[in-house]
């Protein structure tokens, strides 16, 4: 369970309201320039990973609040930041750390309102280590004033950083996308799943008429000359990589939505005005999508803030309450924008429910991907459901287990682990599990996974952490049986189970084959001349049939299994691709 916000001390409140400098565009005038910590040219390997091994200096830390102040020089692509973190720990300690990209120049570091001399902190590799002459009692405030040119992604959002783009009219268009590398690409944070602040407050200063859209609720704006400061505040825990900056000459669509639970909350879309008719059409898709998720999973988790969508120069990302959208208003054969639906799914699977270790990232992406066929079924029926599932089935790699049960960074998941299988294979595992459990038990399990309870209502839940074992325990409870065998084969093994079907003179024999001969008593539907029989498959199973009978195993595609036809198709695609290159 994610920890609830802890009340701030009077000292912390004073620092937040009084200690921020009037300008964060230059080093404080009392700081000798010789003491300014210079940046490195490139981000370090430490910065470019998120999650994984936890630094000894961070193991006992949590973040109660993050106060983030940003301003920009758009011509020079410089970000100026002033961050105050309220940190907590179970016991006093003299040394602790947060993470920040070494590309930034450190101008000031303050601990509990006192500026630290240069020899009391270092940021050699992207871990900003702070040392005190005495034990620090917690909660404590750490303020970092910094500036520099942040990492610019080559291919966002797959490559992370701050994008400095231009609109068609030549206006600045800035967006952040840092899921793969982490929050430390543009603000000091604890770059781990557990590093989520219980509360985040943002002050974003931009030249008029630019608009700054971010997480949470817009408290107010303040004009000073040619600049405008947007003051935003979250009301719940937010993923660190989900804290996002979006700046452009946005227009705004807003409406109030009443959910199936009876509560009302705002829907907002920040968009560029060039394609207003298409923006309106996209915005009109939101109410039906929300109703789908609330019917199938449970209440929208952040109704006390907003449902937010923002147009970005990259494809998209699940930034909490300000989902990034850059799919160019494309439609697919499902009749909806799949990208917006997928990213919005992460409000439930990723933001309300967060994996406690990136090794369990399939809980975000597998469920997020399964929501597209499920939504197609909700809108159009079973045929549309299987069209989506079949499209997803074609690309499975099955090279690594989906879950390794080790501590992993997100990079490890993609470079050393299951990579794209956390999406489509994860979705197919979920589809198969639904068939085994039946809809009632399955959807109760999913709801409990997301909310920690089966009866969520607005106001009776908070964001939670979970992992694969948590889900297995929930599934076993609601199925009233032990389905460990299912997860042993589908999640903890790489290879798919294979069905052998052997025809002989007077019958047909079915058997499951798995790596390491793992038990796999998966029930199997068999169609004989159009009549369906279900086999329990506790062991080898034989049926009497003649050589003229038509026998189809799993005619309704309920079971994810090895099928040679998909391997042949992948081989043909690869061969055809190589031929075109020549």
Where are the model-predicted features located?
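N-terminal, polar/Ser/Thr-rich
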Residues: 18-80, 165-172, 194, 484
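A surface-exposed beta-strand-loop module
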Residues: 34, 96, 101-165, 542-547
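Glycine/proline-rich low-complexity spacer/linker segments in large multi-domain proteins
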Residues: 55-58, 136, 146-200, 255-256, ...
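Beta-strand-rich binding/interaction modules
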Residues: 106-111, 483-484, 504-556
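Zinc-dependent metallopeptidase catalytic helix centered on the HExxH motif
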Residues: 178, 287, 324-387, 446
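Acidic/His/Gly-enriched intrinsically disordered linker/tail segments
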Residues: 235, 365-432, 436-437, 453-456, ...
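Amphipathic alpha-helical substructures
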Residues: 419-508
